[in-house]
Design a protein with these regions (language model features):
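Charged helix-capping and loop-helix junction motifs
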Residues: 42-44
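Short beta-strand element of the alpha/beta-hydrolase
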Residues: 12, 19-31
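Serine-hydrolase catalytic-loop signature spanning alpha/beta hydrolases and amidase-signature enzymes
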Residues: 32-34, 58
Length: 173
């Protein structure tokens, strides 16, 4: 939005050389109750170190709609649209980093995540297929209305839409 600061962490290979060009991978989990930016070295983010050692720049960036600790506007940014709210921020962060750091190759961009991060990775490559060249979606919850009702209604709102269900025994209901 040009106003909200986004915070993140970058992992580089142990043998990092600033004269080389590295593909970048975004490690994601969209929240909306959690900012997927580590403040310590831990097991959950260990795969980011492993990917960096394979020759990638790896990032984890917070996005609008994440942590409630950054204020109501920031936290509720994604309310009503759990699919799209983190995508633009992730893409923008990668573009900004590539502009600042010439060793990042913005033509070779990947994204991966688990659960909500898997959902986000799939949505990202489907929404921006010319930008993201690869995506890994581990256990993505791709339909939040059947994933977890309390979570969806809390963070996306309740819907009263009537859906037609196909029933092979009794016909449509």
């Amino acid at each position: 939005d040009g106003v909200t600061d986004l915070y993140g962490v970058m992992w580089k290979p142990f043998d990092f050389d600033s004269t080389k060009h590295y593909p970048i991978i975004s490690s994601v989990y969209p929240g909306p109750f959690y900012e997927y930016v580590p403040t310590q070295f831990d097991f959950i983010h260990g795969r980011n170190t492993q990917l960096a050692q394979l020759g990638f720049i790896v990032i984890a960036v917070g996005h609008r709609g994440g942590s409630p600790m950054r204020g109501k506007y920031y936290h509720t940014y994604g309310f009503g649209n759990l699919r799209d709210y983190p995508l633009a921020d992730d893409k923008y962060a990668i573009e900004q980093l590539a502009d600042c750091y010439p060793y990042i190759d913005a033509t070779r961009v990947g994204i991966f995540g688990h659960s909500g991060g898997g959902f986000m990775a799939t949505a990202a490559i489907c929404t921006y297929p010319d930008f993201y060249k690869a995506a890994v979606s581990a256990a993505g919850n791709h339909d939040n209305y059947i994933y977890n009702k309390w979570f969806t209604e809390t963070h996306n709102g309740a819907t009263e839409e009537k859906k037609v269900v196909k029933d092979s025994v009794n016909g449509d209901r």
